[in-house]
UniProtKB/Swiss-Prot annotation:
Family from the record: Belongs to the NfuA family.
Gene Ontology BP terms: iron-sulfur cluster assembly; protein maturation
Quaternary structure note: Homodimer.
Transmembrane parts of this sequence: none
Official protein name in the record: Fe/S biogenesis protein NfuA
Keywords assigned by UniProt, alphabetized: 4Fe-4S, Iron, Iron-sulfur, Metal-binding
Listed cofactors: [4Fe-4S] cluster
InterPro entries named among the record's database cross-references: Fe/S_biogenesis_protein_NfuA, FeS_biogenesis, FSCA_dom_sf, HesB-like_dom_sf, NIF_FeS_clus_asmbl_NifU_C
Species this chain originates from: Pseudoalteromonas translucida (strain TAC 125)
UniProt cross-references to HAMAP family, sorted A to Z: Fe_S_biogen_NfuA
Keyword Cell division among UniProt keywords: no
Protein function: Involved in iron-sulfur cluster biogenesis. Binds a 4Fe-4S cluster, can transfer this cluster to apoproteins, and thereby intervenes in the maturation of Fe/S proteins. Could also act as a scaffold/chaperone for damaged Fe/S proteins.
């Protein structure tokens, strides 16, 4: 689930030496599976460990992960890096914003995953997002835009030249896209 480099393990062990006995490290994700997901590391006293938590054994301490965060911390890596600028603890969690999907995932799951991992990070630069409403029997992916995309004058270009092309290329079952958003231009609109 989570790999912690030997240098990071030594760093944690050193920090934990100044804490109460049986204090461990908790690794977590706030807002998992969303574009606002943020990972964190904190001290975890023994009395804060829940029955549903997952314990990972490391050199001199346990890593504690709550059940909700666990799938989003799959393949996460924690390292303690020293360079000419100093030292830094890094936590890379490639699945924090969208969990991995299995090879036999439904078309809806695969399309939603593509929107969450490929499209929404780009739209987030403009304060926008898109979600899948449904996929029709004719293979049309019906989408709804929000945030800065609502009312944006460039939405047709984003929809047809960006999202639709990517979806048709990636999913042979998709024949097109449709936007059901009731666009209202305002201060929130990007363009």
């Amino acid at each position: 689930m989570i790999s912690i480099s030997e240098t990071a393990q030594a760093h944690f062990a050193k920090l934990l030496a100044d804490q109460a006995q049986q204090t461990n490290i908790r690794v977590f994700v706030v807002n998992p599976g969303t574009s606002q997901a943020e990972c964190g590391v904190s001290y975890c006293p023994e009395d804060a460990v829940e029955d549903s938590d997952i314990r990972l054994n490391f050199n001199g301490f346990d890593g504690v992960v709550d059940a909700e965060s666990a799938p989003f911390l799959e393949d996460a890596e924690i390292d303690f890096v020293t360079d000419k600028m100093g030292t830094q603890l890094t936590l890379k969690a490639p699945n924090a914003k969208a969990r991995k999907i299995s090879g036999d995932a439904s078309l809806n799951e695969r399309v939603q995953h593509m929107l969450e991992t490929e499209v929404n990070p780009q739209l987030a630069n403009h304060g926008g997002q898109v979600s899948l409403v449904e996929i029709t029997a004719a293979g049309i992916a019906v989408l709804q835009f929000g945030g800065g995309c609502n009312g944006c004058s460039m939405i047709d270009v984003t929809l047809k030249e960006g999202i639709e092309k990517e979806m048709i290329e990636k999913f042979e079952e998709i024949t097109g896209v449709a936007d059901i958003t009731e666009h209202q231009a305002g201060d929130h609109s990007y363009y």
